[in-house]
Amino acid sequence: MAKKSKIAKYHKQLQLIEQYADLRRELKAKGDYEALRKLPRDSNPNRLKNRDRIDGRPHAYMRKFGVSRINFRELAHKGQLPGITKASW
């Protein structure tokens, strides 16, 4: 599991991105890069690192499911991911 401080930072960053999304869009359309530069760094969605929804793990993240490979495997074995079956050949 990731450190609680990292998970809290991730949620704070998500909130900042949501808060400044409309303003960023307007400033980009105008081409006002000076005002864009004055916005908080963490309001830029490019700086966001995808994290597992369950335990906050940043590595081996599967975008389609929103979880890491470890939690994906557990959820798939429990049958909690619709449409996922174990391969056998």
Swiss-Prot record:
Which Gene Ontology terms describe the biological processes this protein takes part in? translation
On the tree of life, the source organism's domain of life is Bacteria
One GO cellular component term of this record is: small ribosomal subunit
- Any single Pfam family the record assigns to this protein: Ribosomal_S14
The protein's job, in short, is: Binds 16S rRNA, required for the assembly of 30S particles and may also be responsible for determining the conformation of the 16S rRNA at the A site.
Indicate the quaternary assembly: Part of the 30S ribosomal subunit. Contacts proteins S3 and S10.
The protein's name in its UniProt record: Small ribosomal subunit protein uS14A
